[in-house]
């Protein structure tokens, strides 16, 4: 986030959380609740509590738990065990009551109106790459996301896959963390690795691996094939 001139601005800490075992409870069954359920169910368990549900919520109920309840009568018990609560009913006063009770219980709250204590960013996910974007202006957030999506070509996805595969080998070949970081930087700065990614993933991988083994690097530069180098190991 970039801080505006407004002195009341409070910066938020960007985090990537493992939500696979953390429950998100959404109060309300309308379009907003549907949108939230579609997002959060990609990451972990979701429960939607409402008197009624949109057709899409009902049609995809294998992705989340639907609980029919008159929230005006009882909502407090559904906050038990929740990690994040999302008050998304059409009743603003009810939403405030849910939020107040959640805060009292130590449950995080994602508001659907206004800025709460949990802000859901705009997310770009391509392969093993995840980028989260947030600004104070939704239009700017969307603009940034579109620009970044244009820049995030398949080569970057290939590089993420390549480095993920190479990382365990680097730990064995290069004991020192600083030396490993230096090797990764040299891979990222190697134009030949990037060029090969567009033609042959395996050749790009062997070229990248050679940064950890100087003798292999010298042989590649001299014209040895990646296949011969692989047999030499």
Where are these regions (language model features)?
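Glycine/serine-rich phosphate-binding loop and adjoining beta1-alpha1 elements at the start
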Residues: 1-19
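Rossmann-fold NAD(P)-binding glycine/threonine-rich loop
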Residues: 92-136, 140
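Short, hydrophobic beta-strand segments that form beta-sheet elements in well-ordered domains
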Residues: 26, 45-50, 109-111
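NAD(P)-binding Rossmann-fold cofactor-contacting core
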Residues: 35, 43-60
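Glycine-rich, highly charged phosphate/nucleotide-binding loops
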Residues: 61-80
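An accessory alpha-helical subdomain
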Residues: 135-233
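Short beta-strand and adjoining strand-loop segment in the mid-core
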Residues: 45-47, 82-92, 128-137, 150
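Glycine-rich adenosine-cofactor-binding loop
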Residues: 15-38, 50, 162-172, 176
């Amino acid at each position: 986030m970039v801080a505006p001139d407004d002195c009341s601005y409070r910066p938020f800490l960007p985090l990537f959380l493992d939500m696979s075992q953390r429950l998100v409870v959404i109060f309300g069954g309308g379009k907003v609740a549907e949108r939230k359920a579609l997002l959060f169910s990609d990451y972990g368990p979701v429960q939607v509590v409402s008197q009624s549900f949109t057709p899409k919520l009902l049609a995809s109920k294998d992705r989340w738990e639907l609980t029919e309840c008159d929230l005006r009568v009882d909502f407090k018990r559904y906050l038990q065990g929740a990690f994040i609560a999302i008050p998304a009913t059409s009743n603003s006063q009810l939403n405030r009551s849910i939020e107040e009770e959640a805060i009292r219980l130590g449950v995080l709250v994602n508001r659907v109106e206004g800025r709460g204590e949990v802000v859901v960013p705009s997310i770009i996910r391509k392969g093993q790459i995840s980028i989260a974007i947030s600004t104070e202006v939704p239009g700017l957030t969307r603009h940034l996301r579109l620009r970044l999506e244009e820049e995030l070509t398949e080569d970057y996805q290939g590089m993420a896959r390549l480095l993920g595969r190479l990382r365990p080998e680097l730990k064995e070949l290069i004991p020192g963390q600083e030396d490993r970081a230096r090797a990764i930087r040299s891979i990222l700065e190697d134009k030949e690795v990037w060029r090969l990614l567009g033609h042959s993933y395996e050749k790009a991988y062997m070229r990248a691996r050679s940064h950890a083994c100087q003798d292999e690097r010298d042989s590649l530069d001299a014209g040895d094939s990646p296949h011969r180098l692989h047999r030499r190991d």
